[in-house]
Amino acid sequence: MPKLILASTSPWRRALLEKLQISFECAAPEVDETPRSDESPRQLVLRLAQEKAQSLASCYPDHLIIGSDQVCVLDGEITGKPLTEENARLQLRKASGNIVTFYTGLALFNSANGHLQTEVEPFDVHFRHLSEAEIDNYVRKEHPLHCAGSFKSEGFGITLFERLEGRDPNTLVGLPLIALCQMLRREGKNPLMG
């Protein structure tokens, strides 16, 4: 049975994969994440997830390698990590009363036989109308400077939302586990069977 590799250094993705109670290792993929001018958000996350998984194949020749990538889209534009408090406030002002869509690309690459499975999972976050004071308090309390969209849904960010829509809530954090379990079963690795 091939071993499992998570092509990511994200502590959030690692924590999500640990929910499946299967043995895995993490490795950092070497991928240029620059978007191409002709790529849609869906195409971007699909390409990057695939490249991340395949980039580790030579180092891990008989493994199942998981690649994942996510973008946050508001008004048709990709919204990155804010990095500063002012940018976080600006992103939250734009999101207030709107729908933010997260696209998460997932790839599972079997480096032993070259079989690749891919999927893109959308997830919609419906923001309630936020006051300036709420935005300021949220940024001060949660400090979401390294989170796309300027919030942490698994934390205090839940207070910003009116509704969440998607097949798998794990998608919003960065790794669609329902889709991943389906892919793993197709490769003969059922998380419920060890």
Curated annotation (Swiss-Prot):
The record marks W12, Q70, E154 as: Important for substrate specificity. The active site is at D69 (proton acceptor). GO terms for biological process: nucleotide metabolic process. Keywords: Cytoplasm, Hydrolase, Nucleotide metabolism. It catalyses: N(7)-methyl-GTP + H2O = N(7)-methyl-GMP + diphosphate + H(+). It is an enzyme of class 3 (hydrolase). Its EC number is 3.6.1.-. One of its GO terms (cellular component) is cytoplasm. The keyword S-adenosyl-L-methionine does not apply. Disulfide bonds: none annotated. Its cofactor is a divalent metal cation. GO terms for molecular function: nucleoside triphosphate diphosphatase activity. It is found in: Cytoplasm. CDD domains: Maf. Its main location: cytoplasm. InterPro entries: ITPase-like_fam, Maf-like. The keyword Hydrolase applies. It comes from the Bacteria. Nucleoside triphosphate pyrophosphatase that hydrolyzes 7-methyl-GTP (m(7)GTP). May have a dual role in cell division arrest and in preventing the incorporation of modified nucleotides into cellular nucleic acids. NCBIfam families: maf. PANTHER family: 7-METHYL-GTP PYROPHOSPHATASE (PTHR43213:SF10), BIFUNCTIONAL DTTP/UTP PYROPHOSPHATASE/METHYLTRANSFERASE PROTEIN-RELATED (PTHR43213). Belongs to the Maf family. YceF subfamily. This is 7-methyl-GTP pyrophosphatase. It comes from Escherichia coli O6:H1 (strain CFT073 / ATCC 700928 / UPEC).
